[in-house]
Design a protein with these regions (language model features):
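Short, non-helical or kinked segments that cap or interrupt transmembrane helices
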Residues: 31-42, 100-111, 140-151
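C-terminal ends of transmembrane helices
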Residues: 19-24, 94-103, 135-136, 180-184
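Cytosolic, membrane-interface loops and tails of multi-pass inner-membrane proteins
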Residues: 21-55, 184-200
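Loop-to-transmembrane alpha-helix initiation sites
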Residues: 125, 141-149, 159-171
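Interfacial segments of multi-pass membrane proteins
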Residues: 49-52, 75-79, 94, 109-138, ...
Length: 200
């Protein structure tokens, strides 16, 4: 029951889409941002940072990180054990599938990173390093997004046990699903390289 409660707590926090709030504060509908952008309509940090502004992107970075941290912290304070893992995982689900948006939210990249930092603080950097190298070589953020949870799977299996590993596997599958359309575009050669120097 405790795990279910933490999933619910995390889900509700995850449903708070900071990018949507920031976009509305700038009189922008995040779903209508640059339809030609590889991050079109995505209520996430990358979309805001690339198409609205760097400072606004930092606000999303802070907000999405905070909601994941608070979800896990509350779960830890309530149960005093590792159920916070489910709070963080629930936050990913809420961010990706908010009920008030017809279960169509963000891609959960930042929230997943924060979750990894919490559940594997000694090893998360390995996944991020590999993902960063992939992005640096390819210029495609989506490839990095799907790389880091995939790399995290064997790490979780070795150090975190089967239960947490299953959640990490699910997070990797979700990342692939949420980035599927862009991955198809990459495969077909229709996905342009992201120039980070163009951040406003």
């Amino acid at each position: 029951m405790g795990k279910i409660i933490c999933l619910i707590i995390g889900y509700l926090f995850g449903c708070i889409l900071t990018a949507e709030i920031v976009a509305k504060a700038n009189n922008i509908d995040v779903r209508e941002i640059d339809p030609e952008s590889p991050h079109r309509g995505n209520p996430g940090m990358a979309n805001i940072m690339l198409n609205v502004g760097f400072k606004q992107g930092l606000i999303v970075l802070f907000g999405d990180s905070l909601k994941a941290i608070l979800a896990m912290l509350i779960c830890y304070l309530i149960f005093k054990n590792n159920y916070y893992i489910y709070g963080g995982f629930g936050c990913i689900l809420g961010h990706n599938f908010p009920f008030y948006r017809k279960f169509n939210g963000g891609k959960g990249v930042l929230v997943t990173i924060i979750w990894f930092i919490a559940i594997m603080p000694k090893y998360f950097w390995i996944s991020l390093l590999v993902a960063a190298i992939v992005v640096a070589i390819s210029g495609k953020l989506n490839l990095g997004a799907v790389t880091f949870p995939i790399v995290a799977v064997p790490i979780a299996y070795k150090y975190l046990g089967i239960e947490t590993t299953i959640l990490v596997v699910i997070s990797a599958i979700l990342m692939i699903i949420r980035n599927y359309k862009d991955l198809v575009c990459i495969y077909k050669g229709k996905y342009n390289r992201v120039d980070l120097r163009k951040i406003k």
